[in-house]
Structure formats: C-alpha cells, structure tokens
C-alpha cells in the first residue's frame, strides 16, 4: 500500500512537471514566432491557425526545445488548444504539420520581421530563451498563488484534524490533555470581558459580537496567514515582454493571487455553513463554532475579492482600457459577483438577522444561488471551474441530505403540541421514526405545515433539542419529546393555537429533519463528577448529557449534581418525570427559584408533586434573585478537589446566563488545582 501511494505521488509530480514544461514551451514558441510577419494581424487567431507556415514554425520550435517525448506531445497539444475554437487539430495532425515543415525550414532573418514569411522558420533561440525565462517567472508566480490558495484550505484541514484528535482522545480513551492553565487563559474566556453570546454595544449603538480567545486565536492566525500569503513573491525581472512597468506586473500578480485565494475559500465557506457538515460528528465542534468559522472565512474571502476587484479596476483605469474591460462578458459577471458577495456579507450581520430572520433567510439563500451563477459566468472562460462546481456540489449535497432525512423519518408526520395555562413552553411529542437514532446532544429541525398560517412559515425549519428516547420514557415508549419556548414568529403562533385548543393540546402536521448534532459516542469510563447548571429551557439541553453519563460504568463512586434555575415554578410540571429519573440515579437535584414571590396558588401546585414523594424529594430553593454563579462553581470545585475527582460542568441557558457561567468557571479555575476542570456549554445562540 505504501509503495502504491509513493508511485502514485511520483506519477502526479511527473505529470504536473510535464504539463508545466509543455505550457512554458508552447507559450514561448508562440511569443518568439510573433516577432515575424506571417501576414496576419496580432489579434487574428483565425489567420494564424490556418497559416501553414506559422503552424510549421511553432511545431518546429516545440520539437527543438522539448527534452522528452511526453513533454513534446503535451506541448503540441497545448499549441493545438490555442486553435481549438478555429479548427480542431489532433496530436497526429500536429506531428504531420511538423514533418511537412521540416522539409522547408530555414533560419529567420531580420527582413522576416517586415516582409511576409513564405516558409516555416526555425526557432530564434535567443528570443525563445528570453520568453521562456519571463514566462517561467509568470508560471512560478501562478504556482505560488496556487500554493497560497491551497495553504488556506490546508490551514482549516489542520484545525479540524487537531479537533478530531482531541475529540477522540476525550470520548474514546478518556484522555483530556488540555491543562487547566490553557483553559483558563485561552479556551474558555472571552476576547473582551465576559461577552460571548451577548452583543456588546459601543456607545449604546454600534453592535459588536465577541468570541472566546481560543476561537479568536484560530481566526487571527488565519487572517495573518492570508495577509502574509498575499504579500510575498511578486517580484519579476525587468524588462518584461508583456508588462514593462513594474507596477503593472506587480498589480497583475497581486490581483491573480487574491483571486485564487478567494476562490479556494469558496468550498470552505459553504461547507462550514451547511447543516450536513460531515466534520461536526468527528471533530466534536458545535454548529455554532463552525458557523463562527464560516462567517470569518466569508469575511476573508470577501476582502480578497475586493482586493482583486480594486486592483483590476485601478489597473484598467491607469492603462486606459477600463471601458474595453467592462464590455467583456467575464468582467461584467465579476462585478456582479462582487456586488452579490457584498450584499450577502452585509445582510448577514446579527443586527439584521435579529430584526427580521425570515427576510434574512430568503435573501441569503437567493443571493448564494445567484453568486454561484455569477462566478460560473465569470470563470468559465478563465479556468478554475473546479472551485465553482465545489460550491454548487456542497449546496446540492446539503439539500439532498435534508430531503433524505425527511424521507427516512417518514415524510409527513403528526406531532402533538401541549402546554399548561400559565406556561409559554410548548411540549412537542412525535412518534419516533424507525431510522431515527437518538444520541445525546441530538437535535432535529421541524417544518410546521398549516394552511392557516403565513405561507412562509412552511418553508422555515426550526431546531429543537431531542429530549427522550425509546427506552427512557415509560409513559411514551415510542415518542420523541422536545420542549420549545415561544418567542416570536411561528413558535408564538403555535402557542396561541395550543392555548385556544381544548385541554391545551393540538395536533400539527410536520416534516421532521434529523437527527443532527450526533458525534463520536462516549465510550470511556466516567471518572469525573458531573455538575449541570441549567437556566430556563436550557434544562432540555443539559438533561440528555446526564442521561448518557449516568448510564456509563463507575458512576456510583462519584458525586453528581443537577441545578435548574427557573423564574416560574410552573415549569416543574412539564419536567417532573425527568427530574425524578435523575434522583433515582443518585444524582442530587436542586431547583433554584429566582422569582419575586412564591406565595401564590400556582407555586403551591407546582411544588406539591415533589413534597408528596419523600424518597425522591427534590430541593426547591427560593432565592428571589439570581444565584451567585461564581460561588456555586467555586464550592463545587472545592468539593471535587477534596474528593480528588475531576469535574465537568454542563451549562445551558439564555445568552446572559451562559456568559456569566462561563466567566464563573474561568474565575474558579486556579493554577494550584490538582484536579481537571472542564466546561461543556450548550447554546441556543448560533
């Protein structure tokens, strides 16, 4: 196998070398032949391709300067390709042209530059080698540009490889090689204060979104790599036969490199932004992390496209040929593609998404399809079409996988929606599809189909965390359960329908697309204390992690705690069974009530179910304010250290809660700790 790979690599290298040499030979032969008068104007390709003396001269040049038969054949076919739009020449045709010309070849003379040549000429070796050296410089720059373009792609390959290794070490072998000091200073803290999911407003007007230092460092290295790749290796010897001023050649090189680097990022941008990203399961990185990298790859790609466009425009204006460039088909489509990209980037900002997500989604999808079409027409005469087809392929792959998931889940299904009088939480139950494989952290998208709702609601899909599985819920053994908090849009419409229905229960037709979020299964034995801290509906995301971990071996020797922070005790009604299950698994469960008062009927009814069961009693602590998360984290770390057990915190809740809890964990990690502290954060913010 190793020998086969080596031979394959050698073949590819040899083939690339042959093709590069053939391109240089054919281009240089054409350039030196252009010094002489063959009775054709400089722009009349049809005249040259039908002129037997010109064809004989360039084929003779290729024969004289090719060092191998393979290089010769490739060079002859490169020459033939120059005439493919006028007349199709086969390799045999080109060889016959040379054989005929070899009977009449003569050395070129000075008069041949002004007087029409009547027979084929031998190559002007001085001119040929001059053009070869200059063309080699252009070719070398092109190769460097391709290396730089691939370098950006392989940067992300390296990032994903590192994430995959860490994920497998952790979940399969139970090894966490990340030191506490690295987590405290790099992985967990935000770039700016404790802002991560929340939006920071400068002067209360300008919105800024910050990420963690770890993800920020990855993006910073990516940006620096891009700048460095764009900045080196643009020099060329002067005088140059095509662009004599240095500025013109330098601008051409910068434009070409920016162009190739931007195009190489197209598949990265599209792959990181789709739902069916194949790297999510193996790397363990969340959809929100890939979405962050998707945005920054798009930003960098856009800036490279802007550099390419500005340089091309400035060069055209300075040379006085801008008007003629605008009349060219590929140039106009390049302008269209740049405009489309700028619109996509601008309207994708969080401030616009939050104001009207439906409008954002419609524009984003339409513009992406239009962008692919624009890039096709921009590049189909220039080359590099593989990158363009990759975008279309990734987009089609994602749509195909979505349709397949819906079909595998049974197509049109009926979901039961229910709630209580005083709750804005909707419980969605749907029969578990045969091929739906549940795994902790899994979520699914739902399309709600209703002729009475706005038409665009049926085209929207909303992600919900899947809570239950077949062998966990004895009351609904074949049901998938999801909890949804009604905010605005379709969820608010659904809540209104449920509340107005008898018994607050209604059936709804849906398409179920999933599961997503499935990753490498947790195989290693559990040797850590687990502390889950959820706020509000975040309990639905944290609970499945405890279900998975509490079923693993060696849990009896460890201490696990589950905190649920609520501002409405009526929430306990719809999550009572799950909390009782945790108690049965020897997990300490505490409900922290942050509301202003519990002296009401609803509150009494909410807690009554827990007080009746003495053996499975759940603590309800009424703080009437937000808990001190820093103190909670410090106390749990201290207890784990006394037991000499590593500890993992699971957290999920609103953006403010997640940021506060993340900051609390950062503050709680101390360099003197002898145990490993880890944070697993689930987020509703993408």
Curated annotation (Swiss-Prot):
Entry's transmembrane regions: 149-169, 216-236, 260-280, 297-317, 329-349, 359-378, 384-401
Catalytic activity field: 2 a Fe(II)-siderophore + NADP(+) + H(+) = 2 a Fe(III)-siderophore + NADPH
Subcellular location: Cell membrane
Topology feature Cytoplasmic, residues: 170-215, 281-296, 350-358, 402-686
GO biological process: copper ion import; intracellular iron ion homeostasis; iron ion transport
Residues annotated for heme 2 binding in this entry: 308, 378
Signal peptide positions on this chain: 1-22
Effect of residue 378 to A: Impairs heme binding
Extracellular side, ranges: 23-148, 237-259, 318-328, 379-383
Ferric oxidoreductase domain location: 258-398
PROSITE patterns cross-referenced by the UniProt entry: FAD_FR (PS51384)
Binding residues for NADP(+): 514-517, 652-653
The name this protein goes by in its record: Ferric/cupric reductase transmembrane component 1
Organism of derivation: Saccharomyces cerevisiae (strain ATCC 204508 / S288c) (Baker's yeast)
């Amino acid at each position: 196998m190793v020998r086969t790979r080596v031979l394959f690599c050698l073949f590819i290298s040899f083939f690339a070398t042959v093709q590069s040499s053939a391109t240089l030979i054919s281009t240089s032969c054409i350039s030196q032949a252009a010094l002489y008068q063959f009775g054709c104007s400089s722009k009349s390709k049809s005249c040259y391709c039908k002129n037997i003396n010109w064809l004989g001269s360039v084929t003779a040049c290729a024969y004289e300067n090719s060092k191998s038969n393979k290089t010769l054949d490739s060079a002859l076919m490169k020459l033939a390709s120059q005439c493919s739009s006028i007349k199709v020449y086969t390799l045999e045709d080109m060889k016959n042209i040379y054989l005929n010309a070899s009977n009449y070849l003569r050395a070129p003379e000075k008069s041949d530059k002004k007087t029409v040549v009547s027979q084929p000429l031998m190559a002007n070796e001085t001119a040929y080698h001059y053009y070869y050296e200059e063309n080699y410089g252009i070719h070398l720059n092109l190769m460097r540009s391709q290396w730089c373009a691939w370098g950006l792609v392989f940067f992300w390959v390296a990032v994903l490889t590192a994430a995959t290794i860490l994920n497998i070490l952790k979940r399969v072998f139970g090894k966490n090689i990340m030191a506490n000091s690295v987590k405290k200073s790099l992985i967990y803290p935000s770039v700016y204060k404790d802002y991560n999911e929340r939006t920071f407003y400068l002067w209360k007007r300008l919105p800024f979104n910050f990420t963690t230092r770890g993800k920020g460092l990855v993006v910073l290295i990516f940006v620096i790599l891009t700048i460095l790749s764009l900045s080196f290796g643009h020099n060329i010897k002067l005088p140059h036969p095509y662009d004599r001023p240095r500025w013109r050649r330098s601008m051409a090189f910068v434009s070409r490199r920016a162009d190739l680097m931007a195009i190489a990022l197209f598949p990265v941008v599209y792959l990181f932004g789709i739902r069916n990203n194949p790297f999510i399961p193996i790397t363990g990185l969340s959809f929100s992390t890939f979405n962050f990298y998707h945005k920054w790859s798009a930003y960098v790609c856009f800036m490279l496209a802007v550099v390419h466009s500005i340089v091309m425009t400035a060069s055209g204006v300075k040379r006085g040929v801008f008007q003629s460039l605008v009349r060219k088909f590929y140039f106009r489509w390049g302008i269209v593609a740049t405009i489309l990209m700028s619109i996509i980037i601008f309207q994708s900002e969080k401030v616009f998404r939050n104001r009207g997500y439906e409008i954002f989604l419609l524009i984003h999808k339409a513009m992406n399809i239009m962008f692919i079409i624009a890039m096709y027409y921009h590049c189909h005469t220039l080359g590099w079409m593989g990158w363009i087809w990759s975008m279309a392929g990734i987009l089609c792959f994602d749509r195909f996988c979505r349709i397949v998931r819906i079909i595998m889940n049974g197509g049109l299904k009926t979901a039961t929606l229910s709630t209580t009088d005083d709750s804005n939480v909707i419980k969605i139950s749907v029969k578990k599809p045969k091929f739906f494989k549940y795994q902790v952290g899994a979520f699914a998208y739902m399309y709600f189909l209703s002729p009475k709702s706005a038409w665009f609601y049926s085209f929207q899909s909303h992600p919900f965390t899947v809570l239950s599985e077949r062998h966990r819920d004895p009351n609904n053994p074949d049901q998938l359960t999801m909890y949804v908090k009604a905010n605005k849009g379709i969820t608010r419409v659904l809540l209104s329908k449920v509340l107005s229905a008898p018994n607050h229960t209604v059936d709804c037709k849906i398409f179920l697309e999933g599961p997503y979020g499935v990753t490498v299964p947790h195989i290693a034995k559990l040797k850590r204390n687990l502390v889950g801290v959820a706020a509000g509906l975040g309990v639905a995301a944290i609970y499945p992690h405890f279900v998975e971990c509490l079923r693993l071996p060696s849990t009896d020797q460890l201490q696990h705690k589950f905190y649920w922070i609520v501002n409405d005790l009526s929430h306990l009604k719809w999550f009572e069974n799950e909390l009782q299950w945790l108690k049965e698994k020897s997990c300490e469960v505490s409900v922290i009530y942050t509301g202003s008062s519990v002296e009401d009927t609803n509150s009494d009814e909410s807690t009554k179910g827990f007080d009746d069961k003495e053996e499975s009693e759940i603590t309800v602590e009424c703080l009437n304010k937000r808990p001190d998360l820093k103190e909670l984290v410090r106390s749990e770390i201290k207890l784990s250290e006394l037991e000499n057990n590593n500890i993992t915190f699971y957290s999920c809740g609103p953006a403010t809660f997640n940021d506060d809890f993340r900051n609390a964990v950062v503050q709680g990690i101390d360099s003197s700790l002898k145990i490993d502290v880890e944070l697993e954060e689930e987020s509703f913010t993408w």
